[in-house]
Amino acid sequence: MNATVVIPTYWAGDDARANAPGTYDHSTKLNATNPELDRCLASLEQVRDIPRIILLVVCPISATADVSRRVHEIVDAHPTLKVTVVTNTQASRIADRVAQIAPKGSGECVSLRGYGAIRNMGLACAAVLGHDAVVFLDDDETVIDADFMKRATYALGQQTRQGLPILVKSGYFYDRDGSPLAPTDKVGICHRWWTKRIEFNRWMKKALSGTRISRSNYVCGGLMALHARAFTRVAFDPFITRGEDLDYLFNMRMFGYDVWFDNEWTVRHLPPESEKRSPRFMQDVYRWYYERAKLTFAAHQQELVPVTAASLMPYPGPWISRELDRVRKTAMVRSMFTREREGYLRIWRHGIDEAKTYARQNDASYLRFQSFWPKIMDELWRDAQLTSILEGTE
């Protein structure tokens, strides 16, 4: 198997932007003394048979040169690793080629902007370079096992005893305290209607105690392996604001495939603290209203398999059900009992209606883009000109 490890890494153009509310959970400061990426790459040096690493460098266009220089400094400090760096410069060439292949269906669906589009850019780069398996890893994670790649590719591309193909699988992460479970210490009215911890932990405990490979209701985007038979046929959704990893599970099920869980494949997750929570909550509001609208639309398409809340219990079923009234309640109480009063109050007053409008206007957008995806992948596969661009030989 010719696998590659794909790592999206998020950078700010300056210190002021690093902690500003924005599209991504965190962005590394340009002058950070101990950047997450350096720690992640250092952990990969111990891995046996580590393949090519593709770094997707996400940053403002105006900061591309400075960020590229900083990232290359970090990469040069790990000479035993084979790293292909993809900045806005290389990504724009791939996006241009995608637009030529599918002029009516691409837009920014394959780019370094937006979680789903960034994942698609990783898949596009893998296709250009001829890799038949992609292992996604996040830059705020560290690998804790020298057999990481052996575990990553275990059973991938094979079948279960029932003859079901294992084309996508997820591992899981340990937090700072060494636990694979979601913390249950956040209680009180601010979390009363907006917590998935109990349902998630119930599912996770069962998965951890079962066979090594089991059918999954969960995806850890920072530890996810995809075979080419999946990623050349099913794209990530570039229209979802966050949660593109779990959404990929829904997409796979729509097309009649399963995602699998490997309870022996792990990393350690060490995310930086988030300074503001209301922007992330707003993204989640958009996410869940859009998800419900998209799945409802897809359920009416004859050629697709309906994805229902009942089939995703105990988690994440409730989040795609009609229980989304929890959004308004949560926004209201957080506007009263947190320091981010203005942010949550704006969500309560306007954000929910805006999210509903977005969901209604885009319920068919993913399937429209997805119809072009197999052709995009076929045309990109081992593209000689793009290969020379990515490998710096053009």
Enumerate the language-model features and the residues they cover.
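Acidic donor-binding loop at a coil-to-helix junction in glycosyltransferase catalytic cores
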Residues: 241-248
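Conserved donor-nucleotide/metal-binding helix-loop-beta segment in metal-dependent transferases, i.e.
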Residues: 144-168
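A recurrent flexible, glycine/aromatic-enriched loop bordering the glycosyltransferase active site
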Residues: 205-225
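N-proximal low-complexity "stem/linker" segments adjacent to membrane-targeting elements
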Residues: 1-49, 54-66, 392
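Short beta-strand-to-loop element that shapes/binds the nucleotide-sugar donor at the catalytic cleft/hinge
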Residues: 163-187
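Terminal low-complexity segments of carbohydrate-biosynthetic enzymes
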Residues: 283-394
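Short beta-strand-to-loop acidic/aromatic patch adjacent to the donor-nucleotide binding site
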Residues: 131-145
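Active-site-proximal specificity loops/subdomain of glycosyltransferases
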Residues: 68-125, 129
